[in-house]
């Protein structure tokens, strides 16, 4: 039996057991006012399942191999960049990014990065893991993003950057934050896991 036939059989078996694709792992009956609203989670269709099966069955690595290289090239082209580095999660991406920026700009342990007080721990953890100090800024209650006025108030001689992470994909006042960063000659760092391409 060929690998393609094995993949076809596996796809058919998964569809029989789980239902037609696309498939959401947290798929449950939704009851308004009672059920939680899942805004993320594993979601895939036949294309992703087929690539996963081929990668496993043909002995290719998922972590860094042919499929990841293809994706990195397409991703770079879409966003007009020379290259991209894919990692296993947004948490790892933030950790790699902060470590690279610290080295590139010569940041010292104890230097400060301004972050929103509302967001994910994956924005704050890499700051701490790299020996930097998070400085928290309050939010506005319209879109749950920065109180822009407070960002400028929190800047000190040790501030090296502002780490943005749009809450639930809600855009923040990018122009105002960029203006502040440019005036104080600090870096604007973006975690776009929830707003990629927006």
Describe the function of each predicted region.
Residues 19-21, 103-183, 187-192:
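PLP-dependent aminotransferase-like
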Residues 64, 68, 90-94, 119-120, ...:
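Conserved donor sugar-nucleotide recognition element shared by glycan-biosynthetic enzymes
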Residues 195:
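Acidic/histidine-rich catalytic cores of soluble enzymes
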Residues 1-62:
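N-terminal "arm"/small-domain region of PLP-dependent enzymes with the aminotransferase-like
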Residues 198:
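Active-site "gating" loop of Rossmann-like NAD(P)-dependent oxidoreductase/epimerase domains
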Residues 66-112, 126-130, 136:
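Phosphate-binding glycine-rich loop
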């Amino acid at each position: 039996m060929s690998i393609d036939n094995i993949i076809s059989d596996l796809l058919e078996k998964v569809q029989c057991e789980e239902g037609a694709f696309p498939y959401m792992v947290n798929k449950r009956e939704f009851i308004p006012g009672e059920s939680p609203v899942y805004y993320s989670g594993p979601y895939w269709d036949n294309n992703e399942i087929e690539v996963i099966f081929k990668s496993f069955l043909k002995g290719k690595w998922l972590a860094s191999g042919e499929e990841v290289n293809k994706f990195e090239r397409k991703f770079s082209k879409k966003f007009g960049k020379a290259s991209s580095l894919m990692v296993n999660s947004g948490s790892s991406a933030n950790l790699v990014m902060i470590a690279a920026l610290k080295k590139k700009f010569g940041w010292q342990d104890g230097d400060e990065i301004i972050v929103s007080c509302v967001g994910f721990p994956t924005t704050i953890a890499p700051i701490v893991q790299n020996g930097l100090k998070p400085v928290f800024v309050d939010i506005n209650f319209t879109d749950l993003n920065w109180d822009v006025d407070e960002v400028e108030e929190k800047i000190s001689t040790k501030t090296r950057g502002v780490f943005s992470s749009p809450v639930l994909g809600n855009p923040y006042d990018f122009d105002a934050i960029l203006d502040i960063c440019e005036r104080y000659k600090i870096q604007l760092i973006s975690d776009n896991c929830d707003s990629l391409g927006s």
